[in-house]
Amino acid sequence: MSFTIKVKEEIIAASSKDIAELSALIKMSGSVGLTNQGLTLSISTENAKIARHIYQLIENRYRCNPELRHYNKTNLKKNRVYTVFVAENVNDILSDLQLADSFFGFETGIETSIMEDDDAGRSYLRGAFLATGTVRDPEKGRYQLEIFSVYQDHAEDLASLMKKFMLDAKVLQHKNGFVTYLQKAEDIMDFLIVIGAMTSKEIFEEVKIMRETRNDLNRANNAETANIARTISASMKTINNIIKIMDTVGLEILPVELRQIAQLRIANPDYSIQQIADSIEPPLTKSGVNHRLRKINKIADDL
């Protein structure tokens, strides 16, 4: 099950059944038809649980008898489309949800009453996400939450609604419409809180922390590996120079303080500068060890 579906099923289970949620679902996934008996309303989704949720919202609020239909786009089960079909009281439903103008082309944004009410705004965002929202699985890397709108003013109203909740929402033109999106992990987690998906928020946060911890460990390991490589490279250069001195003139020609360092380096090729410094009596500073190693290297270079 995708992370998007998990979020949607969680908010369905915790739905407040506010009419703003139903308004978003119908506005973004619905279409109006006309028969000899009057207007019909169809709301379509590829998720059976969302279809059942819409069915129950309409049935409970308007005391009508919707039909739940389905068909396959192809022979693949995952492409099954579910439609809640309403053939009675459609005018009353559209009027109650203030959607009549939306379906007849006069108003494609979000109702002012929803934009101005925080609770209604939360419910509308919940319905909008149920209708066309997606959120990238946090395990897969780059974070992204999107809600698709056919009309630009609706996408921009969604962004304004999100900004009321301190979310950094942006709008991008997309094929056949517009996308309102969030890209920051913190904004996505806050959005999940706004729409009531607390469990999904906690899962998202846990995955985010684990990914960041893994990345930090990888960076630390890479840095440590690089440091070890540099230490070994520098150590081998000095060891080769010490061997050159031994083979050419012998270590006995070195002053005592340099001979002591040379013998330690030959005996402990994997030691860091700090470890060499700590092994000398009395202990030296790292800069003191480096100074003596430079002298040894210069002597070898001059031979």
Curated annotation (Swiss-Prot):
- Please give the superkingdom of this protein's source: Bacteria
- Any GO molecular function: DNA binding
Q: Which InterPro entries match?
A: Homing_endonucl (IPR027434), Sporu_reg_WhiA_N_dom (IPR018478), Sporulation_regulator_WhiA (IPR003802), Sporulation_regulator_WhiA_C (IPR023054), WhiA_LAGLIDADG_dom (IPR039518)
The keyword tRNA processing belongs to this UniProt entry's keyword annotation: no
Q: Which GO terms describe its biological process?
A: cell division; regulation of sporulation
Keywords in UniProt for this one? Cell cycle, Cell division, DNA-binding
Q: Entry's Pfam families?
A: HTH_WhiA, LAGLIDADG_WhiA, WhiA_N
Q: Which Gene3D superfamilies match?
A: Homing endonucleases (3.10.28.10)
**Looking at the keywords, is Cell inner membrane present?**
no
Q: Which residues bind DNA?
A: 272-303
Checking HAMAP family in the record gives: HTH_type_WhiA (MF_01420)
Function comment? Involved in cell division and chromosome segregation.
Family membership noted in the UniProt record: Belongs to the WhiA family.
Q: State the protein's name.
A: Probable cell division protein WhiA
- Species this protein is from: Streptococcus thermophilus (strain ATCC BAA-250 / LMG 18311)
